[in-house]
Amino acid sequence: MKATMVLTPLALAMAAVLSVSAYAGNEGGWHPPKPNPQSNNKGGATALVVDTQQNYNNKVSNFGTLNNASVSGSIKDASGNVGVNVAAGDNNQQANAAALASADASFVFGTATASTSVLQSGYGNTLNNYSNPNTASLSNSANNVSGNLGVNVAAGNFNQQKNDLAAAVSNGQYSTAGSAASQTSTGNTTVNSANYAYGGTYVSLKLNADGSYKGTSDQIGDVYLDTWEGQTHPGGSNTGHIDVDSQAQGAKDLNHDGGAFAFKEKGDVDLKGTVSGFIPAIVGFKTPVTNNASLSNSLQNVSGNVGVNIAAGGGNQQSNSLSIAAGCSSCPAGGESLGF
């Protein structure tokens, strides 16, 4: 299984739009937390990101499966909010979320609040890898980027990755920023083993067998041989017959079945043969399970908030969270705006 990403300028623009999973406001049916009625603040701005990733009771068996996830030559000279997720394997969870809030000049006594909360839990998962290489790489990418950048690259199984940003700005004198992350991983089972490498070999067999046989031949019943005058049968007239039963002179009935002819025999049996063919055989072991995660020639000349997660293997949990709150006691009319 292979996942590769090369972003075009159009894809960059779409990623910048689609990666915003929560926006502080009243549109779309989402409502931010209500202000405290006991507070003396007349207004404010709130940005909140709450994320939960759960991965449990799954079972995956890989036999020689190749999982390669890579980002190469992409996300260059981008600005704004950019989120990229690349995964290869099974049951991987990735997300990039941003929440932005800005209060105008009328909320001069308000408070700017930004917070992120991330919960990742993985339990009861079973992973069996047999000669299964996992490779995750970020190469020559995300250079000269400014703004908020989140990149997740995972190869394998049951990996959880998060990049979250919450930012709020207000003309109020107070600002609050909070960030919380919880990751739990219990009751998981991972088995990494090398798989057999099967082949075949040509075989040639020769067979030589010796044996012997011993037995007795006996006449059963009375037999009478006819005699004729002519040279051919039935040429001429019948002159009589010859008795070969037990009543003949000197005859003996060997097996007491009425016959007088008995022969003892003895012989040898000689068996020879050649067998050849092709049979399967175990000729060794394939390459054992290998997990490679690499970052090369990337993230150069970057400014702003950058979160990058690269994971190879199984059951990895990664999170990058940032909360920014800006308040101002002497801002000009119109307030400030965030540069994202």
Swiss-Prot record:
Q: Answer yes or no on keyword Cell membrane.
A: no
Q: For the region Linker 2, what residue ranges are annotated?
A: 168-290
Its localization reads: Fimbrium; Secreted
Annotated region (Linker 1) at 101-133
**Record's protein name:** Functional amyloid subunit FapC
Can you supply one Gene Ontology CC term for this chain's record? Answer: pilus
Residue numbers covered by motif Cys-X-X-Cys: 328-331
Residue ranges of FapC_R repeats = 67-100, 134-167, 291-324
What's the stated role of this polypeptide?
Answer: The major functional amyloid subunit in this bacterium. Upon overexpression of the endogenous six-gene locus (fapA-fapF), cells form large clumps during liquid growth, make large amounts of biofilm and produce amyloid fibrils.
> Where in the sequence is the signal peptide annotated?
1-24
Q: Which GO terms describe its biological process?
A: amyloid fibril formation; cell adhesion
Q: What phenotype has been reported when the gene encoding this protein is knocked out?
A: Deletion of the entire fapA-fapF six-gene locus shows no visible growth phenotype.
Instruction: Please give the organism.
Output: Pseudomonas aeruginosa (strain ATCC 15692 / DSM 22644 / CIP 104116 / JCM 14847 / LMG 12228 / 1C / PRS 101 / PAO1)
Q: How does it assemble?
A: The major component of purified amyloid fibrils. Fibrils are resistant to boiling in 2% (weight/vol) SDS and require >90% (vol/vol) formic acid to dissolve. Interacts with FapA in vitro.
* The UniProt record lists the keyword DNA damage: no
Q: Which UniProt keywords apply?
A: Amyloid, Cell adhesion, Fimbrium, Repeat, Secreted, Signal
**According to its UniProt record, which protein family does this protein belong to?**
Belongs to the FapB/FapC family.
